[in-house]
Amino acid sequence: MNIKFLHIIIFVSFLLPACQQGKRQPDSTSNVHHVVVCWLNEHGNKEARQKVIEVSRGFSAIPGVIDVRAGRVIPSEREIVDSSFDVAIYLSFENEQKLFEYLNHPIHKKAVEKMLKPLVRKVVVYDFIE
């Protein structure tokens, strides 16, 4: 199997459906936080890193998104800190339903397909609710 194709499959499997919870009903009253940690195809590439950051900030135009933050890693010598990634993205939503809507929104889908997938080799997503 082509290694690039495998990376794309892994990327899609983490980024798109990682936040969906089967048939469980979303909590409609609590803020939801969505943290996306990205490793670039070309680790340390400043242009690619900036592109991911800029594209991510555009997610603020999606209804239900309260806040979007994106930035680069802070290198650290501390053992507990994983500073192997390139970019982290943080989004907050009004509730779980808005997170699900964001994942399927055309702006998000287009950004993932056209701009992020070509630049990112690995993604890890953390979702939590207050």
Residue ranges and their predicted role:
Residues 4, 17-18, 30-31, 105:
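Intrinsic low-complexity/disordered segments
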Residues 7-17:
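Bacterial N-terminal signal peptides
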Residues 19-85, 94-98, 128-130:
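Short S/T/G/P-rich N-terminal loop/turn motif that feeds into the first structured element of a domain
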Residues 54, 61-63, 92-125:
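An amphipathic, aromatic/His-enriched active-site/gating alpha helix that lines ligand/cofactor pockets
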